[in-house]
Amino acid sequence: MKLTCVAIVAVLLLTACQLITAEDSRGTQLHRALRKTTKLSVSTRCKGPGAKCLKTMYDCCKYSCSRGRC
């Protein structure tokens, strides 16, 4: 019985802490779009405009591969 009560109190406490920190961090991320593009360019291995490419590899970042160039 005591163990059940301790477990319930612990779950309620952890839930309350998560809700409090979620409300505190709301609106603090300033440049969401910039972070997304930076993260994408770092996480993928793609080639920039003018780089050599293959149509079957899909390795151009923004452009499609035409005539062997991005």
UniProtKB/Swiss-Prot annotation:
It comes from Conus bullatus. Omega-conotoxins act at presynaptic membranes, they bind and block voltage-gated calcium channels (Cav). GO terms for molecular function: calcium channel regulator activity; ion channel inhibitor activity; toxin activity. Keywords: Calcium channel impairing toxin, Disulfide bond, Ion channel impairing toxin, Knottin, Neurotoxin, Presynaptic neurotoxin, Secreted, Signal, Toxin, Voltage-gated calcium channel impairing toxin. SUPFAM superfamilies: omega toxin-like. It is found in: Secreted. The keyword Protein biosynthesis does not apply. Coiled coil: none annotated. This is Omega-conotoxin-like Bu1.
